[in-house]
Design a protein with these regions (language model features):
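A detector of single, family-specific signature residues
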Residues: 1-361
Length: 361
């Protein structure tokens, strides 16, 4: 059977046809990532091999392979999507260390011809949608974290004593006060009862009037910068507005993600320490777990498998994680593993066992 290797690019792809014996048929084709370009690929194949059966191979390069994969899948073709590391390994076997799109598409076809490869596939539509939302949520969380850091930088300059009043600068009570008053001068001049009402409301009656008094005293005695107050307060107002907007986005995202998660018969969230969103993220990244031949394959997919360093009789005992798999899955696993280690569960017991064996956190 003929093999069509496709080197994936953002605006153009490159295709090469290889015979079952490993001979390239004709020259490679460069085609645009459009309907017209995909049609030219079909014409190119027919011109070179007619209606002979063929399969396709391509690398999982970012998200750029999705459209051509969908196009070919709709036409009933078999498509093998491989990890770029696999074709890179074959490239290193060639004497000429050349890399261009034409050679890459040929090498991708060769990987498929040799048959020594693992495949990636387009996920179920609901899994794909949930994965997109979870990854987008991750980027929104990162943006919010950056804003929190910038708020902290401003407060360290204009009111360095303020953060010590709370467990964290950006807790609800703290942000409620800053949103209303912005500067230490405004806090100092605020009526005590008005300030306390904000504190009482945002803390759900957990904090007393003593906290309002303490904050006002700190504002009156602050060692913060006194100049350019208007510029600092303007920045602070914009940053708080942006953070409030992102909070609303995250809330809406969570609702969307949970709608998809509830479509699956998944019980990850029943494990103590794993929340619904974390469970959805893990499920979205793994997809159909049956596509992994073993637990080791799943561990490698997450990139938490240890690297192996051996030479002759030497074997390293200080190996690190490969970090070659999905960074989103790896991050989610790290977070839930940390949380689970604090809960009374079998995972906590296993964590303590490993710590007792001398393993680091």
């Amino acid at each position: 059977m003929y093999i069509v290797g496709i080197d994936i690019g953002k605006n153009h792809h490159e295709a090469s046809i290889v015979s079952p014996e490993g001979k390239q048929i004709g020259r490679s084709l460069r085609f645009a990532t459009t309907h017209k370009g995909a049609d030219s690929l079909m014409s190119f194949i027919f011109k070179n091999i007619g209606n002979s059966p063929c399969v396709f191979g391509m690398e999982a390069t970012g998200h750029y392979w999705y459209p051509i994969y969908s196009f070919l899948k709709a036409k009933g073709y078999t498509i093998y999507v491989i990890n770029p590391i696999q074709s890179d390994s074959l490239r290193k076997m060639y004497i000429r260390q050349t890399k261009n799109d034409s050679i890459d598409s040929f090498l991708i076809a060769e990987v498929i011809r040799f048959g020594q490869f693992g495949t990636t596939s387009m996920a179920d539509e609901n899994i794909l949608a949930m994965r997109q939302l979870c990854r987008y949520r991750d980027s929104v969380i990162s943006s919010r974290t950056e804003i929190k850091l910038r708020i902290g930088t401003i407060m360290e300059q204009i009111f360095p004593e303020y953060e010590k009043q709370f467990s964290s600068l950006c807790v609800s009570t703290s942000m409620g006060i800053l949103e209303k008053y912005l500067t230490p001068e405004n806090i100092e001049n605020a009526p005590i009862d008005e300030l306390f009402e904000i504190i009482k409301d945002k803390s759900h009656n957990r904090l007393t009037k003593a906290k309002a008094i303490s904050i006002k005293e700190a504002a009156a005695d602050t060692f913060g910068i006194k100049i350019a107050q208007d510029a600092f307060s303007f920045q602070l107002k914009q940053l708080i507005d942006r953070m409030n907007f992102l909070d609303k986005q995250i809330e809406a995202l969570d609702c969307q993600i949970l709608e998809y998660y509830e479509k699956f018969d998944c019980y990850l969230h029943t494990i103590p320490g794993i929340g619904m969103i974390a469970a959805a993220t893990i499920l979205a990244e793994i997809g159909d777990i049956n596509r992994f031949k073993s637990s080791s394959a799943l561990v490698a997919f997450a990139g938490i498998d240890p690297t192996v360093r051996q030479s002759g009789e030497f074997s390293s005992t200080h190996n690190h994680m490969s970090k070659r798999g999905s960074p989103y899955l790896r991050h989610a696993i790290f977070l839930v593993a940390t949380t689970c280690s604090f809960h009374n569960s079998p995972l906590n017991a296993y964590y303590k066992k490993k710590r007792d064996q001398g393993k680091h956190h």
